[in-house]
Amino acid sequence: MRRSMPLAQLLPDIPQARDVVISGLVMDSREVQPGDAFVAVAGFGVHGLCFIEDACARGAVAILFEPPAPQGVSVPDGAIAVHGLRARLGAMADRFHGHPSQAMTMVGVTGTNGKTSTVQLLAQAWHRLGVRSATCGTLGVGLYDQLVPTGFTTPLVLQLHQCLGQLRDDGAQAVAMEVSSHALDQGRVDGVHYDVAVFTNLTRDHLDYHGDMEHYGEAKARLFAHQDVQAAVINVDDLFGLRLLHGLANGVRRVGVSVCGHTDADVMAQHLSLNLQGIGFDLVIGADRAPVRSPLMGRFNVDNLLTVAGVLYALDYALSEIAAVLSTLRPIHGRMNRLGGQDGQPVVVVDYAHTPDALGQVLSSLSSHVCGRLICVFGCGGERDRGKRSQMAVIAESNADVVLVTDDNPRGEDGDGIVADILAGFVRPNLVKVQRDRSAAIAAAIGIASAGDVVLIAGKGHERYQEVAGVRHPFDDTEVAMRVLAAMSAQETVR
């Protein structure tokens, strides 16, 4: 059943709002239902006022707009001008949906890498601890293991509060949420109450949007100044994380996590072991320790598990409970997913690594697992940070024995141009194999691999599409790799 509320409760200072009852707040005119208030604010390319006719035709009972109106666009009688409307949307949506984030334990996770893994592992841990958990992030929104894709790492502000209201109504007790730098910069999480704010790391990404690392870091830091944050879990092995920790407001509980034994750490991992069966370490909190043995692969998954441990510690779980549940957590789709490795086949790993730091971490982690060659397949997205393309080439050439460059969501950009940008970063580009057809590149990489080799397919992870010229074509790295491995097995059987 849809909610309804007098608009005056959301805009008590606006006289024109007194006699209107609304059933929803909507920014996209195509999503308006009868009884909704249509919210028109300035976008990156066009003002929402340009879509008033569509919103009214679909049954909008109120038009709220942020002045000034763009030149040449007429404002209909009865439309309500609200100065600073965008900045008020979070509080309005929070109130309209009955303050949903205050009814659940809310954990917001920000950082360049590790957000999705941390969020999904935390929700899985809560689930195993008997907590009805939910997530919001790159993989979608929903109760644990019931995700619905949204197309955003962090949904737009009105959609986000609606999602949180639905999660509350569905019985969620705790929500783990990815909070992107774009979301923080654009006010998408305004009005959300966070119990725990989490920082994973800060490395190069999204500089096409933020301009430089300083502004990128400033956007991430906004999460920790958010209303009502009770605790902050911060990776103090990261220099920016250390700055965050020491800059926290008084009254915020500080939980530093470290794999390097940092003196500011409250939660640490010691005595690490890595092999093809997974990872192991001692979880140390204060003077106490407990063993963790996990089937997850990769050194960076120690960081992810340690971050989850920090959150659970901040929520007052005991060391014994934390260590036990960490040992039960399973891999996440598209994050260091292992395929093959049996009957003389190479091991194939599918991972979402699409930044220089993430690619470097994955390759470095796999190098400790491999006894043969390390073969890397990667590309770079179109219409995104061009500066990282050559950097990823440097990382791949330095850490892999064989490199294949391919397409990875070229979008509206020329794929040959993207490849040229990548190749510019190689010292010996003549040794790099280029195959823009991603399926063919995956097949070629697996085809040249032998038993003992590891093939990394990097960049897309969980994604089930290849975006070319505005069209998302069905594509899944895991499915392609499994088909190639199955064909290899069939050939061996015939022989």
Swiss-Prot record:
Known EC number: 6.3.2.13
Reported modifications of this chain: Carboxylation is probably crucial for Mg(2+) binding and, consequently, for the gamma-phosphate positioning of ATP.
Pfam families xrefs: Mur_ligase (PF01225), Mur_ligase_C (PF02875), Mur_ligase_M (PF08245)
Keywords: ATP-binding, Cell cycle, Cell division, Cell shape, Cell wall biogenesis/degradation, Cytoplasm, Ligase, Magnesium, Nucleotide-binding, Peptidoglycan synthesis
Sequence motif Meso-diaminopimelate recognition motif, location on chain: 408-411
Gene Ontology BP, a term: cell division
Cofactor(s) listed in the protein's UniProt record: Mg(2+)
Domain of life: Bacteria
Gene Ontology molecular functions: ATP binding; magnesium ion binding; UDP-N-acetylmuramoylalanyl-D-glutamate-2,6-diaminopimelate ligase activity
Known function: Catalyzes the addition of meso-diaminopimelic acid to the nucleotide precursor UDP-N-acetylmuramoyl-L-alanyl-D-glutamate (UMAG) in the biosynthesis of bacterial cell-wall peptidoglycan.
Family: Belongs to the MurCDEF family. MurE subfamily.
Protein name: UDP-N-acetylmuramoyl-L-alanyl-D-glutamate--2,6-diaminopimelate ligase
